[in-house]
UniProtKB/Swiss-Prot annotation:
Species this protein is from: Arabidopsis thaliana (Mouse-ear cress)
PANTHER family, per database record: CYTOCHROME B
GO molecular function ontology, one term from the record: electron transporter, transferring electrons within cytochrome b6/f complex of photosystem II activity
Keyword Iron on entry: yes
Annotated protein name in UniProt: Cytochrome b6
Pfam families the UniProt entry points to: Cytochrome_B (PF00033)
Keyword Electron transport recorded: yes
Length: 215
């Protein structure tokens, strides 16, 4: 094993990278509340893992979506556990994100020179809320259907561009298969990709600028 490690070490300088990661200075005022962002990241990773597992059984059609969710909960091996963990970690992610925002605001972590870190955090907050809206519709039960109908109908109040926005969100003039397909695509591909990109930006900025000092 040592020869294999030495081969990689010679080419990638793994030890130098590890030393750089583990030797970052942590200010003495940092406490448990500074871990809220990391907990949010952990919840996101749990979401990715459990969501990926459910894609093996979920069918994004208006005729089969609800039945496929029932199959996951009642027949698929550990399906009930995977979906339950997915739901619990989703709620935990939202809660931890809200607490993280309050902590950053109350400790002044949004001030110069960390404005861009704050902006990426706000974008991540919007993406997290979007996860909730799109994921809520996927079982395609009564609650999910009417939630989608109400949410996608909100832009209709905007003058001129309201109706085109509604049709863009729904994929047609009314809520149906096109809507479910779009929400499934957003929930399983677009939003996770954007979240991963903005999380990477967020953490790189924190890594570069360090943790903000005490008030």
């Amino acid at each position: 094993m040592s020869k294999v490690y030495d081969w990689f070490e010679e080419r990638l300088e793994i030890q130098a990278i590890a030393d750089d990661i583990t030797s970052k200075y942590v200010p003495p005022h940092v406490n448990i509340f500074y871990c809220l962002g990391g907990i949010t990241l952990t919840c996101f990773l749990v979401q990715v893992a459990t969501g990926f597992a459910m894609t093996f059984y979920y069918r994004p059609t208006v005729t089969e979506a609800f039945a496929s969710v029932q199959y996951i909960m009642t027949e698929a091996n550990f399906g009930w556990l995977i979906r339950s963990v997915h739901r619990w970690s989703a709620s935990m992610m939202v809660l931890m994100m809200i607490l993280h925002v309050f902590r950053v605001y109350l400790t002044g972590g949004f001030k110069k020179p960390r404005e861009l870190t704050w902006v990426t955090g706000v974008v991540l907050g919007v993406l997290t809320a979007s996860f909730g809206v799109t994921g809520y519709s996927l079982p395609w039960d009564q609650i999910g259907y009417w939630a989608v109908k109400i949410v996608t109908g909100v832009p209709d109040a905007i003058p001129v561009i309201g109706s085109p926005l509604v049709e863009l969100l729904r994929g047609s003039a009314s809520v149906g298969q096109s809507t479910l397909t779009r929400f499934y695509s957003l929930h399983t591909f677009v939003l996770p990709l954007l979240t991963a990109v903005f999380m990477l930006m967020h953490f790189l900025m924190i890594r570069k600028q360090g943790i903000s000092g005490p008030l």
